[in-house]
Amino acid sequence: MMPNVAPNSYYLNIPNANSTSTTTSSIFSDLNKEYESKIKEIEEYYIKTLLNENTDNDDSSSSEGHNINETDILSEYSPRPSPWLPSKPNCYHPLGDFKDLIISDSRPTNTLPINNPFAGNNNISTLATTEKKRKKRSLEVEINPTYTTSAFSLPLTAENLQKLSQVDSQSTGLPYTLPIQKTTKLEPCRRAPLQLPQLVNKTLYKTELCESFTIKGYCKYGNKCQFAHGLNELKFKKKSNNYRTKPCINWSKLGYCPYGKRCCFKHGDDKDVEIYQNANDGRSKDTALTPLPTSLAPSNNDNITNLSKPRNLHTSVKALQRMTW
């Protein structure tokens, strides 16, 4: 039978931690140092064993003979219980308590313990599948089976209008009628017919009128024609100061020019051009101011056509008729 010992009797050999004095007795100083060094060795040993726990599980067959009994280590390295562990007097704690303390300090709170390294992949796969299921559940939307679209939200097609008329006639027992709305009479305004814009290829440089379009009213080339169809498409090009200042070689040698009015050179002399212009101006002035005599009065349609033709009084009439300006 052990004698009744006070619960704090084993603290007599160790200085009190709450004492005001910082000096320690010289008798027990060596014992405290040895005790602290042994505790450090135990902590280092358990930290190493915990870090190498996975490798020890893989090589369990080779490490069975090298395992050390926990009670033997406790009996050798801990002759006295530590003063900061809450325990009963003259009682020793197993090394499992140290192991739990070290694991709780070193391991994060959110991680799960993995005893078998090969089971880690299975745990990860199960976690991934559970997360996917959660996401699918969050994305799923419950559809109300009793939901029906309102009749007025349907598109206005012939079938839907017939359905609406049938539904309303069945519900009210009366034929479907639209609500009467007050409308104000608008005075009819006269609008000019909209002219569709003709497709015009603006890349072409149209500086001349199309003969077939101006005479016949149509052109077989359409908007691909290189000539202007109307004055709105006609473009004026800038003429240089040397335009038609030199005589045309074809005109002087042959008496005509195949280019006609497109030729950039002068057809005939300056005097010929002046006479031709004066003749046209004099004819237009005479016809506008002086009336025709009774002897030359038009008796028939043929006479009217003959009088309407211009007369050239110049000697080289054929040459002037070939001139096109």
Curated annotation (Swiss-Prot):
InterPro entries: ZFP36-like, Znf_CCCH, Znf_CCCH_sf. GO terms for molecular function: mRNA binding; zinc ion binding. Pfam families: zf-CCCH (PF00642). One of its GO terms (biological process) is intracellular iron ion homeostasis. Residues 292-306 have a biased composition (Polar residues). Gene3D superfamilies: Zinc finger, CCCH-type (4.10.1000.10). Induction: By transcription factors AFT1 and AFT2 in response to iron deficiency. The keyword Disulfide bond does not apply. Keywords: Metal-binding, Repeat, RNA-binding, Zinc, Zinc-finger. Transmembrane segments: none annotated. GO terms for cellular component: nucleus. Residues 284-306 are annotated as: Disordered. A zinc finger (C3H1-type) spans 204-232, 242-270. Binds to specific AU-rich elements (ARE) in the 3'-untranslated region of target mRNAs and promotes their degradation. In response to iron deficiency, promotes the decay of many mRNAs encoding proteins involved in iron-dependent pathways. Negatively regulates primarily iron-dependent mitochondrial processes including respiration and amino acid biosynthesis. This is mRNA decay factor CTH1. The lineage of its organism: Eukaryota, Fungi, Dikarya, Ascomycota, Saccharomycotina. The gene is CTH1.
